[in-house]
Curated annotation (Swiss-Prot):
Belongs to the bacterial ribosomal protein bL32 family. The keyword Translocase does not apply. One of its GO terms (cellular component) is large ribosomal subunit. It holds the Pfam family Ribosomal_L32p. This is Large ribosomal subunit protein bL32. GO terms for biological process: translation.
Length: 55
């Protein structure tokens, strides 16, 4: 793991971290009990098993 040679100021740290952005999970259409909903892929199987409530 890279180790910084010098301490980084708080302003520089926050500036660097603020560049990172989270992306929305891609959604897939799922048909459960005749209703079509859009869910993230990791929740598809849980929805089919009835573990996740879909509106």
């Amino acid at each position: 793991m890279a180790v910084p040679k010098r301490r980084m100021s708080r302003a520089n740290t926050h500036t660097r971290r603020s560049q990172w952005k989270a992306n929305n999970a891609p959604l897939q259409e799922v048909r459960v009990n005749g209703n079509t909903t859009r869910l993230p892929r990791r929740l598809v199987k849980a929805a089919q098993l009835g573990l996740v409530e879909t509106d």
